[in-house]
Amino acid sequence: MAGTRRKSLQNRQVGSLLIFLCISVGDATTIRYSVAEEMESGSFVANVAKDLGLEVGKLAARGARLVSEGNKMHFRLHRKTGDLFVKEKLDRESLCGKADPCVLHFEVVLVEPLQSFRAEVRVFDINDNAPVFLNKEPLLKIPESTPLGSRFPLQSAQDLDVGLNGLQNYTLSANGYFHLHTRFCSHGPKYAELVLNKPLDREEQPEVNLTITAVDGGSPPKSGTAHIHVVVLDVNDHVPQFSRLVYRAQVSENSPNGSLVATVTAVDLDEGTNKAITYSLAQNPEAILKTFQIDPQNGEVRLRGPLDFEAIETYDIDIQATDGGGLSAHSKVLVEVVDVNDNPPEVMVSSVSSPLPEDSPPQTVVALFTIRDRDIRVGGKVTCFLREDLPFVIKPTFGNSYSLVTDRSLDREEVSGYNITIVAMDTGPPSLSAETMIEVLISDVNDNPPIFREDSYILTVRENNSPAVFIGKVHAEDLDLGENAQITYSLLPPKNGDLSVFAYISINSGNGKLYALRTMDYEAIQDFQFVVKATDGGFLSLSSQVTVRVVVLDDNDNRPMILYPLQNGTLPCNDLVPRSAEAGYLVTKVVAVDGDSGQNSWLSYHLLKATDLGLFSVQRQNGEIHTLRQISERDPMMQKLIILVQDHGQPALSTTVSLNILLVDGFSEPYLQFQDPTKHSRKVNPSTKYLVISLVILSFLFLLSVIVIFIIHVYQKIKYREKFTIQEHFYDDCNFSNNLVQGQGNGSLSRPCPYEMCSATGTGNSEFRFLKRFMPNFPFPHATGEIKMEAGSSLPPNSDRNKSQRLEGHDQVSDDYM
């Protein structure tokens, strides 16, 4: 029955408190609510979305959640409606004990973007606990001689409620000896004292039974009772006397059990057993009895349990001294707990944004956290910092809440993630600290273009290759990740006028391998270049370019080509050599070129066959033909030579040329001597010109018919000469005898020899005539003859035989190149 009334009373109290449920917004970041304790699970508290000024749907869209500062969350949030409900029945006494007000703190955290709001709920007390006496039947022994007005402190009742619902008053049952006096304690609950109104008489009434009632201030009030049994003792004239009415002591909260707190002393003037004093902690709450103990013989008060300044700062201990006759006296020991820095700060992370894009701007919020230090006075000031130098900083938001934000730009390619250690340190002494590690991963953004390994590539392909042959590979790397690092290769179209690369080269877009689409010809294209583009697969793709040069390697696929002597198959190619020529005489020179390059174009000359192998030799490097010995009368007049011209390719290719050499008589011996044209003046002697003109005029008058044939023959040879870029200049008004042909030196002689050879066309006889000066010197209008060699000639590079020479005494006209 009593339980039913109690439950009904609680429900009425809950209802009355719900009427006064208050919601307040203290500032822009803190919302406050009030609820009554003992509300059932699921009870409505408030609408958070409305109080925060947010649309209801945004709570769910932004992933709203509650984060408690303690170990347990007592509320739950309905994301769709924004309603805040009680998660489980709230018991203010278990949550906050005797603390008043009782406030529960939590945070409402929103993401995308990251945002938090501080909230607190004050739990109001209801009168759900009645006062309780720990000792239901206390025993008091009072001598009959106790004077009137003597006070006997009683054990205080315990009421878990606070405020008006807590213990308010004591009442005593009606009796003829005592009345009740309520005392107030500054650091504890109210307690009562029995005050003797009437002298006791053991013989009249040896025992007195009393009932004490403790009443709280609830509506309706609750109460608790205890039955006091008073035993009247025989006369004991003196009561113990304490040296002090109040003892004061200070004890550090980290003092170990057994530490001495204080020593109380009392004396009794009686004799015998009435003088013996026993000390006890008789009338004290349970919290004191669990924390302190007293030696009954010497009065030493020592620690029995741990102290916690953050829980209880002071203790008011009632000490009772009882003599052997049953008389007792009371004194107080006020114990002040000294705060020490024994609680390290606590770092409580409420939200972390991970992974974090690497292009996040500075001041981007990464995490939200709160720091709490249970020490109030000592070490209560806390600082926090990052252990390492990282691109993050800590910024205070409000109160003891902080945010971790980016301080500078991030780069995933350098650091893909961070283990951020937050250090919280109080001021001590001694200074205590705590660490919390937050892992933040960095997500990739396409901010790096592909990079080729080389600044440019040079690839080689041998001519006459097979189509689709692999010629090389380009490779680029991208420092990004995933699709941002996937590279596609392509060929860029050529610029105007450049070679169309698409006709020659193809590229594998996936791996950058290059292939030749057609057969290369070194003689047509020696090299070409194009541009390869590498593009990554990012949303906003990045690219880079590299130039690739393809060098075509030469194959030995061209035989040497003979430029001189001409092999036309109609006219014999004859060179004249005087029989008086000495050993080493330069007969002629074979000139050849090769369409290949490098070693494949290096030519060497060999005497393959000859009428007399011991008469002539061919220089291997330049093709000059010299006599090995002096010509004798026994040597046949016609000497036939077959010269082999061979390149240095692998395998080597070769060409042969046939050459006829006529051994003739009649050359003047003095003029067979070799003369260096560089010793002569570059300026042609006028007397020589006059002499030549005179001879030409005489020859023209006598041999007109021969001149016509000669002109036709010269015209044909000029055509051949222009074909091989060998320039010749003839005298327009030169006249020769009708049976003479004028020539310059021998064969491919690069030096003009100052002699004239006249050969009779009709017979095998030949005659050498020295032209003496017979006319005065005067200028001649025609230039001397020139021989120009191709760059591919095998003549020695230091030879000056390919230079134009001016002869002193006559002009050079070569019949061997005609």
Curated annotation (Swiss-Prot):
Signal peptide: 1-28
Primary location class: membrane
Membrane-related topology note: Single-pass type I membrane protein
Keywords associated with the record: Calcium, Cell adhesion, Cell membrane, Glycoprotein, Membrane, Repeat, Signal, Transmembrane, Transmembrane helix
Example of a GO cellular component annotation carried by this entry: plasma membrane
Glycosylation sites noted in the Swiss-Prot or TrEMBL record: N169, N209, N257, N419, N568
Classification via InterPro entries: Cadherin-like_dom, Cadherin-like_sf, Cadherin_C, Cadherin_CS, Cadherin_N, Protocadherin/Cadherin-CA
Domain annotation Cadherin: ranges: 35-133, 138-242, 243-347, 348-452, 457-562, 577-672
Keyword Glycoprotein: yes
Ranges that cross the membrane: 692-712
Biased composition (Basic and acidic residues): 800-818
Molecular function (Gene Ontology), one example: calcium ion binding
Record's subcellular location: Cell membrane
BP GO terms, sorted: cell adhesion; homophilic cell adhesion via plasma membrane adhesion molecules; nervous system development
A Pfam family it matches: Cadherin_C_2
Region (Disordered): 789-818
PROSITE patterns: CADHERIN_1 (PS00232), CADHERIN_2 (PS50268)
Topology Extracellular: residue spans: 29-691
Keyword Calcium appears in the UniProt entry: yes
Side Cytoplasmic, residues: 713-818
Primary role: Potential calcium-dependent cell-adhesion protein. May be involved in the establishment and maintenance of specific neuronal connections in the brain.
Protein name per UniProt: Protocadherin beta-1
